[in-house]
A protein has these predicted regions:
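Sec-dependent N-terminal signal peptides
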Residues: 5-13
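N-terminal secretory signal peptides that target proteins for export/translocation
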Residues: 1-3
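Aromatic- and Gly/Pro-enriched helix-to-coil junctions and flexible linker segments
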Residues: 19-271
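C-terminal motif of bacterial Sec signal peptides marking the signal peptidase cleavage site
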Residues: 15-17
Length: 271
């Protein structure tokens, strides 16, 4: 074994040891990491606060980058399940991959947050003791938002130190790796490379995170909605070739859309 290889292995061991120490430190401070129940009935104040105050900010400032299957770190913030699932270091597109990767389609390839943890996804919300201090200190989103407040977007005509290219190197720290991430990239708080949140937006999100990041359960489908769904599913699932072609054409034009049944209520419910 040559000296260069020994040096590389020592450095790798050092970083691995640092991450392990950080994890142990969080465990000592706030207890072990466990998947938490974060949804509440839509009638509760917590769920109402998420729907009325938090979700519009997330949709306006975060979802623009974190909505697709190939979002940075596979973090999809467009749904309750995506937020709770968290992020992954695995690349969606990897040109050097020689074998097929296990797909990570939300709602398809795992049903619970724990199953996503087993598949390699790490939390972006605090999963240790649910205290206000722990929710901010051991929650990745909270830390990244605070980082942006400490290091606002530089006042530059052309930003320096930000790589927006499609093939840029992916950086997806866990909460245990966050301190090193901030030291290495102080200006990489969230929203990445974008203007800071307004004071109101920032305090709204931090209040939500501090109180456990409670989100809403899904509203049950009504009998009228289910009847409409059944009608369209019957239409789109005829087995003859002509209807198969028609259904495929319709699907290819609608699968990215949010659909609603306009005749059922004045205020549409999107699916």
């Amino acid at each position: 074994m040559n000296l260069r290889l020994i040096f590389i292995l020592c450095i790798a061991s050092l970083f691995a040891g640092c991450a392990t120490y950080a994890g142990l430190n969080f465990d000592q401070l706030f207890g072990p990491q466990l998947v938490r129940e974060r949804t509440a009935s839509v009638e509760t104040p917590q769920a109402d606060f998420f729907q009325r105050e938090v979700k519009p900010i997330v949709d306006n400032r975060c979802v623009v980058c974190h909505a697709c299957y190939d979002a940075p770190c596979q973090l999809k913030l467009s749904s309750v399940e995506g937020i709770d699932r968290g992020a992954s270091k695995a690349l969606v597109y990897e040109g050097t991959r020689l074998t097929a990767a296990a797909p990570t389609r939300l709602f398809e390839d795992a049903e619970t947050t724990q199953e996503w943890r087993d598949a390699g996804f790490h939390p972006v919300l605090n999963e240790r003791d649910q205290s206000m201090a722990a929710n901010l200190e051991a929650g990745l989103i909270a830390r990244l938002l605070q980082q942006k407040e400490r290091h606002p977007l530089p006042d530059q005509v052309q930003l320096e130190g930000f790589d927006f290219s499609i093939d840029r190197e992916q950086t997806c720290p866990t909460i245990e790796e966050y301190e090193q991430y901030e030291k290495d990239n102080p200006n990489w708080g969230m929203p990445f490379g974008m203007p800071n949140l307004t004071n109101s937006e920032y305090h709204t999100l931090m209040t939500w995170l501090e109180n456990g990041a409670i989100m809403n359960m899904h509203t049950p489908i009504s009998d009228q909605e289910q009847a409409q769904i059944n009608q369209y599913e019957t239409l789109l699932n005829h087995s003859d070739l002509k209807n198969q072609l028609m259904s495929r054409y319709i699907y290819e034009h609608l699968f990215l859309s949010h659909l609603y049944f306009s005749e059922l209520s004045e205020k549409p419910r999107f699916f």
